A protein has these predicted regions:
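An internal, acidic/charged active-site-proximal segment
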Residues: 52-53, 57-192
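Charge-patterned, long linear interaction tracts outside catalytic cores
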Residues: 184-206, 219
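Short amphipathic alpha-helical "interface-anchor" segments enriched in bulky aromatics
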Residues: 208-239
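Basic, amphipathic alpha-helical segments enriched in Lys/Arg and hydrophobic/aromatic residues
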Residues: 234-251
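A short secondary-structure junction signal
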Residues: 36, 115-118, 140-142, 197-198, ...
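Short, conserved catalytic/metal-binding motifs centered on acidic residues
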Residues: 1, 24, 104-109, 128, ...
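Active-site-proximal, Lys/Arg-enriched surface segment
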Residues: 1-55, 168
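A short alpha/beta connector and helix-capping loop motif
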Residues: 2-18, 113-133, 236
Length: 251
């Protein structure tokens, strides 16, 4: 298949042959509509194995000239583009077409200052709610410039952790800044011995319970993926050319 290469599967936890698809979904909590998508490949870490393929595999891969079709050229340009930049382009196209939303819900891969800046600068008053990694990113807070793990330790030490019966999680909240933008960080843990996870939002009016409730709507895109795979054979397209793969997903 044209452009196909090795991509890392987070379900199988190993590189597999295929594409990565990114979808933009709109939901009201009941119905969901897929607004846009893009296909991506991974260039690979080794120069002698582009996309994780040996030279013979690369040479044997199907290739086709597309006679300057602008639509295919745009899709091809997306293939190795930054997923953050592509996501912002998707949002721009949707907004131009009249789509309005209250919250953009994203996983930890997309929660970053670039996307945050884009969302809070929109004129119709939308906000970002995203999972954050319990990693090395530092946030400006009244507790100092600390990482998420350092913040939850400080909150535990100061006894600012509460149990929420309604959602069944221990929670903690802290106001912060990232790239000079005010945000709230909400920490959640299931049980006394569970791992801490955290959400970031630009909506300073939310509390931990409401942020949790809103973010849980992101599950609908996982349901949509499952239904597309089961009922519409997503990922089973046998077309060899890239345009055919794009058309198959569009249909």
């Amino acid at each position: 298949t044209e452009k196909i290469g090795k991509v890392f599967s987070h379900t199988q936890m190993k590189p597999i042959l295929g594409f990565k698809a990114m979808f933009l979904c709109f939901t009201d909590g009941v119905s969901q509509f897929l607004l846009d998508f893009s296909l991506h490949g991974e260039e690979g870490k080794r120069s002698d194995k582009p996309q994780g393929l040996f030279k013979k595999q690369t040479e044997a891969r199907y290739c086709k000239e597309h006679s300057g079709d602008e639509r295919i050229a745009r899709r091809s340009a997306e293939y190795f583009a930054s997923k953050i930049e592509t996501a912002i382009s998707m949002l721009k196209r949707s907004i131009i077409e009249g789509v309005r939303f209250d919250y953009l819900l994203v996983d930890s891969w997309f929660t970053c200052s670039e996307l945050l800046k884009f969302v809070v600068s929109r004129h119709f008053g939308c906000h970002l709610i995203g999972m954050i990694k319990m990693g090395k990113t530092k946030y400006e807070t009244d507790l100092g410039n600390k990482t998420a793990p350092e913040l939850i330790k400080a909150l535990q030490k100061s006894k600012n952790v509460k149990y929420s019966r309604s959602i069944g999680y221990y929670t903690a909240t802290v106001s912060a800044k990232i790239s000079s933008i005010k945000v709230c960080l909400f920490f959640y843990r299931r049980g006394k011995n569970g791992n801490w996870n955290a959400l970031l939002t630009s909506d300073l009016k939310l509390d931990a319970k409401e942020a949790f409730r809103l973010y849980s709507r992101r599950w609908v895109i996982e349901v949509a993926h499952k239904e597309m795979k089961q009922n519409l054979k997503l990922g089973k397209n046998q077309c060899r050319d890239f345009a055919g793969q794009i058309a198959g997903i569009s249909l």
